Amino acid sequence: MPRRGPFLALFAGCVSRGASRSPPGHTLTRRPMDPVFLQIGNFTIAWYGVLMMLGIAAGYWLGLKLARERGLNADLFERMILWMLFWGFVGARLVFVLTSWHIFEGIPFPRVLLDIVNLRNGGISIHGGLIGGVLTLIYFARRYRLNFYQYADLAVPGVAFGIIGGRLGNIMNGTDTVGRVTGWPIGYHWPASARAFHEGMCRPNPNPDMDLSKYCHEVGGQIMMTAPVHFTQLYGVIIGIILAVASYFWLKSRVPGWAFWQFWLWYSILRAGWEETFRLNPLTIKTYLNQGLDAPGIGLWTDTQIFSVPLILVSLWMLWRLRQRRQVTVPTVPVQSQS
């Protein structure tokens, strides 16, 4: 495969995302909040793909810049980034399929295989993408006998920018990462122009905890989900911005691995404690659920929240080890007594 083959494959998968939601001849002026960025005939470019790739491109450029400044092998790191993107995307889709198998149950073989690889209706997991990227980096570090953490640290800003772009794309898609119904003042009413959101949320959901169709009414000749919800997509954007800003300070430390494990710690805390708490996801271990027009819109525990607990503990332990190692390696200057 050519050097940029993984990048092109990733882009091709992203740009078509959400194409099935928009009819041919669609124009952006008619639907300001539409998944489709551009449509030419049957060729569709989705906002999700455009925004995510812009975020990744920013991180790609910054990572190479940092690699050159630190005297690392920038050409090799560029190859790493491209393959990390490719296998990260594969991991993101694979984890989504495994954790959302109920979507694919009952689909006959071999059609189910086509549905698994079909990204037009969305479905990726950020944690799966991170795992795929980390495994790729481990492979390169072992093959070329590199310090894994020196290169892993440089990928942190790119991941943060990718989160920002992806969550902005989720806003345009409408039906992705939706929040729970809430009576808090922070509740967001989706505009009538966000047809993908209203059409998606007004379809009956077999899971009563996730069924918002009871809040749907006809307004101005259009079906609309009228209840306020947590704007969890925006929460995700803010989390990405926080991580991007924080990575600037984490990378000031020359201790390899410091930025890498700080990212895992704070992404897990913010994602599980903030975004996921208010997000309309299935509750794997249902210990608390309080949602509705007179409720805060909180649910515990989702798959992501459960998975984040060991990640937080491991990250804290690794950061403690790095701090201890740094204290041991700092040379001490002997104090000479004056006679």
From Swiss-Prot:
Entry binding sites for a 1,2-diacyl-sn-glycero-3-phospho-(1'-sn-glycerol): 167
Transmembrane segments: 43-63, 81-101, 121-141, 231-251, 300-320
GO MF term (any one): phosphatidylglycerol-prolipoprotein diacylglyceryl transferase activity
Coiled coil: none
Primary location recorded for the protein, binned into one broad class: membrane
GO biological process, one term: lipoprotein biosynthetic process
InterPro entries: Lgt
Pathways per UniProt: Protein modification; lipoprotein biosynthesis (diacylglyceryl transfer)
Membrane topology of this protein: Multi-pass membrane protein
Entry GO terms, CC: plasma membrane
Record's keyword terms, sorted: Cell membrane, Membrane, Transferase, Transmembrane, Transmembrane helix
Disulfide bonds: none
Function recorded in the entry: Catalyzes the transfer of the diacylglyceryl group from phosphatidylglycerol to the sulfhydryl group of the N-terminal cysteine of a prolipoprotein, the first step in the formation of mature lipoproteins.
Family of the protein in this entry: Belongs to the Lgt family.
PANTHER family: PHOSPHATIDYLGLYCEROL--PROLIPOPROTEIN DIACYLGLYCERYL TRANSFERASE (PTHR30589:SF0), PROLIPOPROTEIN DIACYLGLYCERYL TRANSFERASE (PTHR30589)
Protein name: Phosphatidylglycerol--prolipoprotein diacylglyceryl transferase
Gene that this sequence comes from: lgt
